[in-house]
Amino acid sequence: CVQQNKKSRSARDMXXSXDALE
């Protein structure tokens, strides 16, 4: 999730919890 978030902000929505780590 974190890796995708760095690639695109839109991906952070999918990650969700992953985004919380960052």
UniProtKB/Swiss-Prot annotation:
Lineage: superkingdom: Bacteria
Disulfide bonds: none
Residue intervals passing through the bilayer: none
Region (Disordered), start-end ranges: 1-22
GO cellular component: ribonucleoprotein complex; ribosome
Record field: compositional bias (Low complexity): 13-22
Protein name per UniProt: Large ribosomal subunit protein bL32
Species this protein is from: Ectopseudomonas mendocina (Pseudomonas mendocina)
Annotated gene: rpmF
